[in-house]
A protein has these predicted regions:
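N-terminal polybasic phosphate/anion-binding patch
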Residues: 1-70, 138, 145, 184, ...
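Mobile beta-alpha loop/short-helix "lid" or hinge segments that flank ligand
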Residues: 23-34, 113-119, 153-165
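Active-site-adjacent loop/tail segments of enzyme domains
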Residues: 76-106, 132-134
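Active-site oxyanion/phosphate-handling segment shared across diverse enzymes
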Residues: 123-197
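Anionic-ligand binding region
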Residues: 97-99, 110-123, 127-128
Length: 198
């Protein structure tokens, strides 16, 4: 049976795959995301290309060490007003992000690349439009106090499957892509490859 490796340390991505019935091994890929993003932004690369490139590099890094496995690399970027957001470094930066995104729409792009034998064999980018409601200062204070360092784990300072749902008035697009993986498309590929029963 073909083994599946997740080239990510994300517990959310791991849980999504395992909850969908997949037996996955986790091997986080170490790539210099900041340098790659910076270089691509300097070349005016669109955000979708940045997410796709990071997912591909993670997938390839682990695939080269595990050529017989299907290796899934993933990356998510948040775009607002032509600005690419990174995960906040601390709670002060998380507050700034929430204040900037408050009452605004932003887009999440979740890229996934599967490699085998050191080559990409499948890729997909899921999209979601996130409409954040206007957030009051007391709400932001209470939210950050409740979520604490958990907001530093995600690019948008929220987990939609938890308290982060309170930030939004509307979400358009794929729910799983909001969580960080275009799960349904991944499952479709695995069925087509015979890894999952059709």
């Amino acid at each position: 049976m073909t083994s599946i490796i997740l080239a990510s340390g994300s517990s959310i991505r791991r849980d999504m795959l395992q909850n969908a019935g997949l037996d996955v091994e986790v091997q986080p890929a170490r790539v210099d995301e900041a340098s790659i993003k910076s270089a691509m932004l300097a070349e005016d690369a669109p955000p979708r290309d940045i997410a796709d490139k990071l997912a591909e590099l993670k997938s390839l890094r682990i695939s080269q060490k595990n050529p017989e496995a299907l290796v899934l690399g993933a990356d998510q970027v948040l775009v607002h007003a032509k600005r690419l957001f990174d995960k906040p470094e601390d709670l002060s930066e998380a507050r700034e992000h929430l204040e900037l995104l408050s009452g605004q729409a932003h887009e999440l792009l979740s890229a996934a690349v599967i490699s085998e034998n050191g080559k990409p064999v499948w890729r997909h980018i899921g999209r979601a439009q996130m409409i954040m409601r206007p957030l009051s200062a007391p709400f932001i204070n209470a939210y950050l106090a409740a979520e604490r360092e958990g907001v530093l784990e995600t690019v948008g300072c929220y987990k939609l499957e938890g308290r982060g749902a309170q930030l939004f008035s509307r979400v358009q697009g794929d729910y799983f892509s909001v969580l960080g993986l275009p799960l349904l498309e991944i499952l479709g590929f695995l069925r087509a490859r015979g890894v999952l029963v059709e």
